[in-house]
Amino acid sequence: MSYRRGSGPSEEEMIMQQMMIKLSMGISGQCFKECVTSFSSGQMVPQEATCIQSCAKRQQSAFMAMNDIQGQLQAKQGAGMF
C-alpha cells in the first residue's frame, strides 16, 4: 500500500486493517487452543504444526464463505429484494 506524501490510510482502510488483525489473532488463538497440547519441548511437534495449518485454512475458508453470503444479502437488500 502506498500513500501520497503527507497522507495515510483512510478511516475505512484503518478499520478494515484492524478487523483483519482481530480476525487473524482470533484464528491463531482458537487454533492454538485446539492444536497445541504439550509444552514440554519448547517447540511444536509436527502434528501440532499440521493441525494449526489445517485449522487456519478451515477458519479462513469459513470466513470467506460467510463474507460472500453477507455480500449477496447486502446486494439483495440494495436491490429492494428483502
UniProtKB/Swiss-Prot annotation:
The lineage of its organism: Eukaryota, Sar, Alveolata, Ciliophora, Intramacronucleata. It comes from Sterkiella nova (Ciliate). Gene3D superfamilies: Mitochondrial import inner membrane translocase subunit tim13 like domains. Pfam families: zf-Tim10_DDP. This is Protein C2.
